[in-house]
Regions:
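Catalytic core of pol beta-like nucleotidyltransferases
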Residues: 1-106, 117-123, 133-197
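Short acidic amphipathic segments
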Residues: 107-111
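Short, hydrophobic beta-strand segments that form beta-sheet elements in well-ordered domains
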Residues: 112-113, 127-133
Length: 197
């Protein structure tokens, strides 16, 4: 395995906090606290990613803040991998909900938000979901086959982008706490454009 692929495999978990705000600059200590990891271990992983030009940094006093350079194609690709990693983690923890989401994701972009995305869901928690596209009877039939309470919002991606720009609270919540399913590329590009400002 090459050095760069080892960096990917061992570091996807430490990049998850960056998905709350793609443009955020974070100290290693801040990420370590949020993930309950040793700061030195995390700093070494971030340094390795930085040396591979996968994340960038700025010096702030004696410390470094790490961030994604959203103008680079590699940042888009890495964010897509991190979003896939989040999806896989979710599916491994919530098997029954995962079956529903896998069915709905065929040919669609989905965003899970709310208590499940924040990892605070309890037994009986409802599923908050955005499906980018039009409401269809096929999707409604899929949802009705499952014993979950599902709150679905059908929204064109262009309207979601517009609501992000105008500061609509639900759109901002979705941008910061989400798990993406299905066709992620367009949603990630929309979030990158929003955070680039």
């Amino acid at each position: 395995m090459t050095n760069i692929s080892q960096n990917f495999a061992n570091s996807l978990d430490i990049l998850v906090p960056f998905t709350r705000d793609y443009a955020k600059e974070m100290h290693a200590s801040e990420i370590a606290r949020s993930l309950n990891l040793p700061q030195r271990t995390l700093a070494r992983k971030l340094e390795a990613l930085q040396k591979s030009n996968l994340v960038n940094y700025k010096r702030v006093g004696k410390n470094k803040t790490f961030f994604f350079d959203l103008t680079l194609l590699s940042s888009f690709s890495l964010l897509e991998m991190v979003e896939c990693y989040k999806e896989i983690l979710f599916l491994s923890k919530h098997l029954q909900v995962g079956l529903l989401l896998n069915e709905l994701a065929v040919g669609h972009s989905l965003v899970l938000f709310g208590s499940y995305a924040k990892q605070r869901a309890k037994e009986g928690s409802d599923i908050d979901l955005v499906i980018f596209g039009r409401k269809s009877t096929k999707l409604q039939e899929i949802i009705s086959r499952y014993p979950f309470e599902v709150n679905v919002h059908y929204v064109p991606l262009s309207l979601f982008e517009k609501r992000l720009k105008t500061g609509w609270p639900l759109a901002k919540e979705i941008a910061s706490d989400h798990v993406l399913f299905g066709e992620k590329g367009k949603v990630i590009k929309s979030l990158i454009n929003y955070y680039k400002k």
